[in-house]
Amino acid sequence: VVTDDNPRTEDPATIRAAVIKGAREANPDGDIREADSRAKAIDEVVAWAQPGDAVIVVGKGHEVGQLIGDTMHHFDDREEMARALDEVLRQSADGASARYGDNDKKSHTLPQEQNEPKEHA
């Protein structure tokens, strides 16, 4: 997912377009996506990830601000990643509650056939 870093006074869409163009030239069959904010990009990639995937957020590192124009806005990739992961986990827990009829979200009991141990040959 291509997004903004510190666009300063440059047009962020122009920067993203140049990065996307280069990425498509390097990998024409790649699934290259664009998000107009880092928070949206992190949300999208975390929601898109499947079990076993690695999500790597690059660009800002330890920085806790994003310079847009002449204004420094608070932004911390680590905080945003934690928030996005919490949201996905909350949605997953809500989905499990709905599937198994458990609304207290404290424990989830699988249907009996899924609880029974399987015999191994």
Which residues does each PLM region occupy?
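ATP-dependent carboxylate-amine ligase
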Residues: 1-121
